[in-house]
A protein has these predicted regions:
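Catalytic-core elements of nucleic-acid end-processing and repair enzymes
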Residues: 439
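Thr-Gly-centered strand-to-loop micro-motif
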Residues: 373-374, 401, 431, 450-451
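Acidic, glycine-rich loop-and-beta core segments that form the ion-binding/anion-interacting portion
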Residues: 333-338, 346, 353-375, 381-392, ...
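N-terminal localization/anchoring segments of enzymes in phospholipid and broader phosphate metabolism
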Residues: 1-357, 361, 405, 419-423, ...
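Glycine- and other small-residue-rich loops at beta-strand/loop junctions that grip anionic moieties
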Residues: 184, 375-376, 410
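Extended hydrophobic/aromatic segments used for targeting, binding, or gating
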Residues: 382-385, 389-391, 396-423
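Surface segments flanking catalytic/ligand-binding clefts of nucleic-acid enzymes
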Residues: 427
Length: 519
């Protein structure tokens, strides 16, 4: 059962009001557009001809576009079936929404920040000698995402978000120079209050503290003046992509990253946001399963740069120079663990699907097993093919999904993928105790990932995300062991699921799947 409080209900109501008035304003704009079309009825023939020509041009462009068919096919169907509506929606939504100025800002910031990271070509060469099975993935990340691979980094794995929070609070309280925190959602309640108390103490001790959060992700959790409250406490605070009452399809691109950096020495990432439900303070969907990792050592540099990218690109005017030297200071650290660590970030503003490509590469490289855990399973044909092909090669491919959903319509789409995967040998497990929000993968006791990237369209194509690729290190075995515990708590989906669905449900799920990439 969901646990409600007056404070939580009030914040939800405030968020609903903001969403309502924004949606109302957008609806009025849409009504106005329809009204204008009806007033132009005398030019109907010319409008239909123009729209039809434009529809053909767009369909040809989509057909030749370098993008997965799972993303282009729904648009082609919509444009051909309903030309006026399809063309209008595509021009508003399908062009990936981000204004040219926004893309230019990110490109400018990246051109200043990413070259500050070391190339570490010698480490990559060492990786090819020690773990060639994983080295190709690291090469891909270094060349295409521009995030290098590191050694000399200790990794601690937390199989529960609450354990990660306690460690995080301890490290935050020891910060000497700076604290960077970037999260999709912050809830102004007990869990955040504990963090806020530590941050305020650190500010008073002279530590620079920055907090960056996504407006849509936090809209039902905090008041609108939250950032102002933080500024009054001395905490520098910025909001990513505020919800506005106007057509702006960049609103579809959210900051889903979850990063904490402390003094450039320690970093945290994982699946959890800074809200009570992630730490099982409340139980809206049964037991909440989330995970995280702590990095200490050289690899922290990449998460520092990833944070500064979003922080600086969110400014309307990018500074001519971004001095990061004070945040990338060298310090002597000798890691106790060995292995290869590679933090990385993904952006919807380029043509590189980094998160999906890493997952596909792991499935392709796996020889014995490749396991995933995700809260949502809404994948492209390419991802589906990689998983089923691995299973056909004899690889033990498994995916864990939630037993209790947080979004029932999305859960219905998730379940619609079960049959096509199961019948080709992929094993699907439903974690019965509650909602698994963790986003991880592990293969062959050699490589693993932990981060924010779900196996769904929004994470793989629409959101700003981050992850950490790890190879030949102790944490890979810890993640594997956690998967084994989760399998023991889960129910396996069999082919009987296919016969257990009514024709009406199958039809509904098929339609939702077809247009899932447009959501």
């Amino acid at each position: 059962m969901k646990e409600k409080t007056y404070e939580g209900t009030k914040k939800t109501q405030n968020g609903l009001k903001r969403m309502f008035f924004s949606a109302l304003a957008i609806l009025l704009q849409a009504v106005f557009m329809v009204y204008m079309f009806t007033r132009l009825n005398e030019y109907a023939a010319a409008i239909n001809t123009t729209t039809s020509v434009l529809a053909i041009i767009l369909v040809l462009g989509l057909y030749n576009r370098e993008q997965t068919a799972s993303m282009t096919t729904p648009w082609i169907i919509l444009i051909l079936a309903f030309p006026i509506m399809g063309v209008s929606l595509y021009l508003l939504v399908g062009l990936n929404g981000a204004p040219n100025k926004m893309r230019a800002r990110f490109e400018e910031v990246d051109s200043m920040l990413l070259p500050c990271l070391p190339e570490n070509a010698d480490i990559l060469s060492d990786m090819y000698e020690k773990v060639p099975q994983a080295a190709g993935i690291s090469t891909y990340l270094a060349k295409n995402a521009l995030y290098p691979v590191y050694q000399n980094t200790d990794v601690t794995y937390y199989d529960q978000a609450s354990k990660g929070l306690e460690a995080q609070l301890s490290d935050l309280s020891k910060a000497k120079k700076f604290i960077f925190m970037e999260y999709h959602a912050i809830e102004d309640k007990e869990s955040w209050h504990r963090i806020q108390k530590v941050l305020t103490e650190r500010v008073q001790a002279g530590v620079e503290v920055r907090v960056f959060y996504d407006d849509m992700g936090s809209i039902f959790f905090i008041d609108r003046d939250f950032s102002e409250k933080m500024e009054k406490l001395g905490i520098k605070c910025r909001v990513f992509n505020p919800v506005a009452p106007a057509f702006n399809m960049f609103l579809n691109n959210r900051d889903h990253r979850k990063i904490t950096v402390i003094d450039g020495k320690i970093a945290y990432t994982g699946g959890y946001n800074l809200a009570n439900e992630y730490f099982n303070v409340t139980h809206p969907y049964g037991i909440w399963k989330d995970t995280g990792i702590r990095l200490e050592g050289d690899a922290v540099k990449s998460f520092t740069i990833a944070f500064l990218e979003m922080w600086n690109a969110s400014e309307r005017k990018v500074p001519r120079e971004v001095d990061v030297s004070q945040y990338l200071l060298h310090y002597d650290y000798e890691a106790k663990q060995s292995g290869f660590i590679q933090p990385y970030a993904d952006s919807p503003l380029d043509n590189e699907q980094v998160g999906e490509d890493v997952y596909i590469s792991m499935a392709n490289k796996a020889q014995r097993y490749c396991w995933f855990i995700t809260p949502y399973l809404i994948i492209t044909d390419e991802m589906s093919h990689a998983l089923t092909l691995a299973a056909k090669r004899g690889v033990d491919v498994r995916i864990i999904t939630p037993g209790i959903p947080d979004k029932k319509p999305i859960y219905s789409v998730t379940r619609s993928f079960y049959n096509q995967l199961v019948k080709h040998g992929v094993r699907i497990f439903v974690w019965t105790p509650g909602f698994c929000h963790a986003k991880m993968s592990v293969a062959d006791d050699i490589m693993a990932t932990c981060g924010t990237i779900n196996l769904d369209y929004r994470s793989l194509y629409h959101h700003f995300e981050n992850g950490c690729f790890m190879a030949d290190c102790e944490v890979v075995h810890e993640i594997r062991d956690d998967f084994i515990r989760l399998f023991a708590e889960s129910a396996e989906v069999t082919e009987k699921y296919r016969t257990g669905r009514s024709a009406r449900r199958r039809l509904g799920q098929s339609i939702m799947r077809l247009f899932a990439g447009l959501l």
